[in-house]
Amino acid sequence: MFMARRIFVVLLSFFVMTACRRGGGDNKGELVGVGGKSWKQPTPYGMTLIPSGSFIMGSSDDDKTASLNAPVKTVSVGSFYMDETEITNSEYRQFVNWVRDSIIRTQLADMAEQTGQTSGGGGIGDFAYLDTNTEKMNAYQQYLQNTYGAQKARKLNKKKALIWDTNKYPDEYYSEVMDKMYLPEEEAYNGKRIMDVQKFEFKYQWLDMEKAARARGKRKDFIKEEIVKVYPDTTVWIRDFNYSYNEPMHNDYFWHEAYGDYPVVGVSWIQAKAFCEWRTLNKNAYQKSKGDYTVNAFRLPIESEWEYAARGGLPGGTYPWGGPYTYDDKACFMANFKPLRGDYASDNALYTVEAKSYEPNGYNLYNMAGNVSEWTNTSYDPNSYEYMSTMNPNVLDDNNRRKVIRGGSWKDVAFMLQVNTRDYEYQDSARSYIGFRTVQDFMGISEKQQAKSARGYR
């Protein structure tokens, strides 16, 4: 009898607790779902919402050459956010600096631990791991330390500013760590040593969902780890053009503030993907610090998304602004490209222009034609339009190193600027005329689309 009464009390307590969590038990035994706070997806900074829709992808039969690898096909894409502009030098430098600083802080913390230095003692100890004192660890950190080893519980002291002035290095240990980040003395130029950018490596993991969904195995079998050198290849300005003087662009384009708002180039498809991973990591770290929901991953657009966005709501347009001409009624060019043979400057730009130049298209996207070509997350296959899906179509083949680029660039003729023109480059190649922009999936449908749906069902 006592045991039965005890079980009843336990069950009653469970239902009371559950009812309290549901807001006072007002569900009256009905199926009302699990409670939660209301949520609305915020618009990411610098992005614009592209509503879902259908469009005719590819080239018309009138263009025999282009239709060989891009025959017309009606497809549908979901809603997503897209960067209004190409990723700029300034934005990519934020990524490079984050990687550089993280590597230095990790090496400083390791050196502090090796030499027995702790925070509060000055010198390199100020950069020691925050959990050096195990007595200050919380229960979860102690569990990680005891179960998986020290590295799982490690936290860097990011509040302490790094010291760049050699005259202010706090001690010899700090000097040793910083010295290893620079090129050796024999590679100094005019007596000035610079950082060895080949050491700026970003490590991340990703889950191959495509293979995981179609093959048997453990989750760990589909987790991939990548280590990517993130610094752009500035030599592209020289290598891409023979018998041409472009050294000023090689010397200044990426790092100088004069080009901060210009699109980053010299970035491979592999590096562009790494940037997307970092952007997601960086944003979600902030979200977690505020106790907010994490956001969807930033990524490269698939080819169908890119063309849909480039059209700007004009299904039959030749260019993002419609067309069929590349200049307006005042004879001003609508994009940065090569108008005539050997003529790069008639549009008032010899190379690239600022990322927010010319008029945006109907979706408020700048330079979807010209300036720099853009990486997509699609493998290039001239026959892919024949077999790909009609819903969010995409072909991504790990064995195919050719990746689709779109939009044309400052060194291309008008044909390459057309919204349906396809081109490709190898994923590990960097060029002076290829950049990228990112997208983020939109969860649900937009308020405008909800209103349309409601009107449609009345």
Predicted regions: what they are:
Residues 25-37:
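Short, low-complexity, disordered segments immediately C-terminal to signal peptides
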Residues 432-448:
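Short, structured beta-strand segments at or near domain termini in extracellular proteins/domains
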